[in-house]
Regions:
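Cell-wall polysaccharide-cleaving catalytic domain and substrate-binding groove, primarily
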Residues: 1-137
C-alpha cells in the first residue's frame, strides 16, 4: 500500500463517504472493485447518490425517521461506538437524536449525510457534491 492510500480515508479513496458495503449493483460503480469490502464509485457524487438512496429506503421502507433510528441501523453498536456516532451527527446537524426527519427536506438530508460522512471519513465533503448526489438519487 502506498503512502497516499494510508493517508486518504478509505471512504474518500473509494468515493464512498458512508462506507457502503459491497452487495448491491449501483449506478456509477467502478468496473473492477479493488477494495473487496466496500463499494467503489467512479465519482464522489455517485457514492453520495447511493448513500441517499439507502437513507431514503431507511426512512420510507423501514420507517426509521430519526437520527438515532437511522444510525442505529447504519452503524450497529457491534461495529461502532453508536452513542458517539449519534452525538457527533446531532452536534453537526444541530438536531436532536429523536427529531423526525423527512427525506423531502433536502437541506436536512444533506446536513445528515455530511455529518455521517464526517464520522465515517473524518473529512468535510464538498456541499455542491452532496446536493448533486441528492438530486441524482
Amino acid at each position: 500500500m502506498d503512502t497516499k492510500s494510508r493517508i486518504v480515508p478509505r471512504g474518500i479513496r473509494n468515493n464512498n463517504p458512508l462506507n457502503i458495503r459491497i452487495g448491491n449493483v449501483w449506478l456509477g460503480e467502478v468496473a473492477v472493485n479493488s477494495d473487496g469490502v466496500f463499494e467503489q464509485f467512479i465519482s464522489m457524487q455517485y457514492g453520495i447518490r447511493a448513500a441517499f438512496i439507502l437513507l431514503r429506503r431507511y426512512i420510507r421502507h423501514y420507517k426509521l425517521t430519526t437520527i438515532e433510528e437511522i444510525i442505529s441501523r447504519w452503524a450497529p453498536e457491534v461495529e461502532n461506538k453508536l452513542k458517539a456516532y449519534i452525538d457527533v451527527v446531532c452536534q453537526r446537524t444541530g438536531l436532536p437524536a429523536d427529531a423526525p426527519l423527512s427525506y423531502e427536506d433536502q437541506p436536512t438530508m444533506c446536513a445528515l449525510l455530511a455529518a455521517m460522512a464526517y464520522v465515517e471519513c473524518g473529512q468535510v465533503l464538498d456541499e455542491k457534491k452532496i446536493i448533486e448526489g441528492y438530486k441524482m438519487a
